Amino acid sequence: MAGAPGPEIREKFQAALALSRVELHKNPEKEPYKSKYGARALLEEVRALLGPAPEDDDERAADDGPVDQALGAGEPRDAEGPGAQRALRLAVVEFHLGVNHIDTEELSAGEEHLVRCLSLLRPYRLSLGCVSLFIQAQNNLGILWSEREEIETARTYLESSEALYNQYMKEIGSPPLDPTEHFLPEEEKLTEQERSKRFEKVYTHNLYYLAQVYQHMEMFEKAAHYCHSTLKRQLEHNAYHPMEWAINAATLSQFYINKLCFMEARHCLSAANVIFGQTGKITATEDTPEVEGDMPELYHQRKGEIARCWIKYCLTLMQNAQLSMQDNIGELDLDKQSELRALRRKELDEEESVRKRAVQFGTGELRDAISAVEEKVRYLRPLDFEEARELFLLGQHYVYEAKEFFQIDGYVTDHIEVVQDHSALFKVLAFFEADMERRCKMHKRRIAMLEPLIVDLNPQYYQLVNRQIQFEIAHAYYDMMDLKVAIADKLREPDSHTVKKINSLNQSALKYYQLFLDSLRDPNKVFPEHIGEDVLRPAMLAKFRVARLYGKIITADPKKELENLATSLEHYKFIVDYCETHPEAAQEIEVELELSKEMVSLLPTKMERFRAKMALT
């Protein structure tokens, strides 16, 4: 290998690197890129001092495209001799010029420099002195094309980097030179250990960018795999920012939650808690330049975001259990519960083998700390009230934690979503509760937390959220009324207080369903002839429940009862008529449509009998 460049070149190059690292906010306000432009001028001086690129490489530069830069393009050779060494150093300079132009938002110029870097390196890409720089240049081009929304091109560059890393490790394996070493004297070269650390960091970045590209392409399985690998490697090489690592692990948990892989989701969230606890406690490094303790706002925001991921974990696990155990009217099916209890024994027997197949974060003390968090949280579906309550309390703990940051003043949408999740936790817990009075109290808690939101919200700006809450409050009152009716049915003769309570709940449910339906009307207060796909099912359910509610009003006045039956029939008829003219609606409410048809058939006869009875009296 040829000797190091002269002192002038080395000094200018090191000065350029130092200027490149100056943070933008440390530049004059009117010249935010002053240090970047200074670094660029020095890099251009270094390039001039190194001399022109070898001719054969220059000629190839114009024809190179991302696909041609795949590994199969020409056999690699060692970077020996003065010409090869000059090409290497020029490539390092071109790389830094490329990054410099991208940092100053001159993307096309940045791309040109990076492509020139690859052209100079291509013949030597698998050599000890080139492989790291070649991968870094391709990674940066991958990011650049990703920002241009050219995701396929970005993917080509990044997958090429991954393949080159794998080929190098398989065929050579020894730690390659870091690009900066081409401008260092022999006595200042890096140790093998430091080279390995830096090369592995480059590859970790490659996996991280691939995860983002696959996510963008909706290749979610692949994205999750690469994200998991990235997080695992960051811990192994101690190259991570605790706050950023924790939020990425918590975000990954959402993928596993949606896949109903609760053991993996729990592991990600437990690891997120442990690593987030390191915030502000680790020594700042090149990888973690910011001292996180100086960012209280961001700290509390990230803490709230991780808490919201935990809420989703608890809620989804409970809801999945409910779906597995409910009958066709949404009540607990004891036979299904017994079947799941039998399955539980099998799940516990297989727990260890499932755990071994799952990717685990950390080793030694870190692994123990993560396991300690995991052991306090169940990952199997709750099968009874006590198990469900355990998850509910954990979810509620994180609701309070999330609300500390996501307050109504400043974070309206986030705050409302957290409250809706809290309500949903009570709703699913009520499914596991056998005592009907206690179930009523749970629905009452839901209403108490949701009704104030309606008062604070401007329906003009928050129409969608407003509708969601109106519908949910209506449903809570509806469920409470059903429970009170079921309790009353067990009495010989319900007293006037019980009747009054049932009618009051009925009226409240009607009020909120009507508010929801009225929100669908046009500015002239006319109900739409065609209901939008996004609100079709809730609108049809609201109509069905309004019809049922009118039929459930308890009154001693025959005339009033006849009016209620007529209103009930009107709403049932609307559902039947709408589904006849809009067949797509029938698929959304098959059960309710069949019941509506029955009521449209039965109610007129019932009303006639009622009129005849009234005439006789």
UniProtKB/Swiss-Prot annotation:
GO CC, one annotated term: cytoskeleton
List of residues that carry Phosphoserine: 174
UniProt GO molecular function: kinesin binding; protein sequestering activity
InterPro entries referenced in this protein's UniProt entry, alphabetically: KBP, TPR-like_helical_dom_sf
Cell location: Cytoplasm, Cytoskeleton
Spans annotated as Disordered: 48-83
Keyword RNA-binding tagged: no
Keyword annotations of the record: Cytoplasm, Cytoskeleton, Developmental protein, Differentiation, Neurogenesis, Phosphoprotein
One Pfam match: KBP_C
GO biological process: one example: microtubule cytoskeleton organization
Functional summary from the UniProt entry: Activator of KIF1B plus-end-directed microtubule motor activity. Required for organization of axonal microtubules, and axonal outgrowth and maintenance during peripheral and central nervous system development.
Family: Belongs to the KIF-binding protein family.
Subunit and interaction comment: Interacts with KIF1B; positively regulates KIF1B microtubule motor activity. Interacts with STMN2.
Protein name: KIF-binding protein
